[in-house]
Amino acid sequence: MKVLGIESSCDETACAIVEDGKNILSNVVATQIPFHQIYKGVVPEIASRKHAEWILPVVRQALSEAQLDLSQVDAIAATNRPGLMGSLLVGLSFGKTLAWSAGKPFYAVNHMLGHMYAAHLVNDIPYPYIGLLVSGGHSIIAKVNGFDDLEILGTTIDDSVGEAFDKVAKYYDLGYPGGVIIDKLAKEGDPKAFTFPVPKMDKGDHRYDVSFSGLKTAVIHQADAFLNKGYEKTTANIAASFQETACRTLVSRLLRAVEDTGLTTVVAGGGVAANSRLRAMLAEHKELNCIFPPLKLCGDNGAMIAGVAYHFLKRGETSPLNTTACARIPQFKRGLANLEAFGRR
């Protein structure tokens, strides 16, 4: 079965066609980065206008690259949460209209389920496993029992790791997108130059949680206080030390989840899953089977949305055409699986 998936939750206009939840027939992503770089971040109004301008040609290109016409597609899917409301509405409205006009079943897909599924597009991964979902909006550690069944173990109590990367890059005028730039710049610096603080959340409900607001503040406003003797305060050293601290924070919480659950397969997803230091740090743990999506599937893409929708289709479910967009999802709670936060309606 072939599913056409649309993703427009932020600043990428994307469409892909995936067969049987695995075989990517086409995967088109139109990036808006050049339009947002001068503002050092995403401007929601610009993002939604570009989505409206690009959505039709992107969908047409996806069909063309797959050598299909719409009649040969079995279902239509689109992201409906979370994200920028204007951006979500463009892709969701287009997807619902396309499904209605073509007489195809429609599926609204949670963006975060998509990121968690991305690695499944190129790997056969049995459930359950420990999921690490790290992006510009989320930092989640979960026990993943199924494609739409995530048992949340820990999350950020303030900023996401991706947001911290972007804010640090913006303050030091490094450019946008911050995560990619810091990753590259860090290779020129020394991660031992600064000893930045990390929150002590070792017990009880916060055992698996992370926090990045304090780290972000230290890097931006108090860097001099954490500079080690014999090192210079260069942007490369700041980038390397910040990245090292952020990644070690994530990995330390992840290892706790591995120890407590006994699960040794770790699957990552989201934009920050492309970070080279995070990948290398996890690779050092030979006792783990760490699976990352290809770099092209770490960022926003339609293939992950189509992949998730295929499993809803196979299960005989559909989303009503009055499905709405939702900019935010309820605060993740420990033990919450696919109820409030991952609801599609």
Regions found by a protein language model. Give the residues of each.
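Short beta-strand scaffold segments in enzyme catalytic cores
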Residues: 13-19, 131, 139-143
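A contiguous, well-structured pocket-lining segment that forms one wall/lid of small-molecule binding clefts
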Residues: 69, 184-266, 275-283, 288, ...
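N-terminal beta-alpha supersecondary unit
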Residues: 2-72, 78-82, 111, 115
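Conserved phosphate-binding/catalytic loops in two-lobed NTP-binding clefts
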Residues: 108-109, 283-305, 319
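Glycine-rich beta-strand-to-loop/alpha-helix junction loops that act as flexible
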Residues: 78-81, 98, 135-137, 267-275
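Conserved phosphate-binding catalytic cores of ATP/NTP-utilizing and phosphoryl-transfer enzymes
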Residues: 1, 109-130, 308
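DPxDG-like acidic metal-binding loop motif
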Residues: 83-102
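Glycine-rich phosphate-binding loop plus the immediately following alpha-helix
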Residues: 146-190, 216-217, 221-225
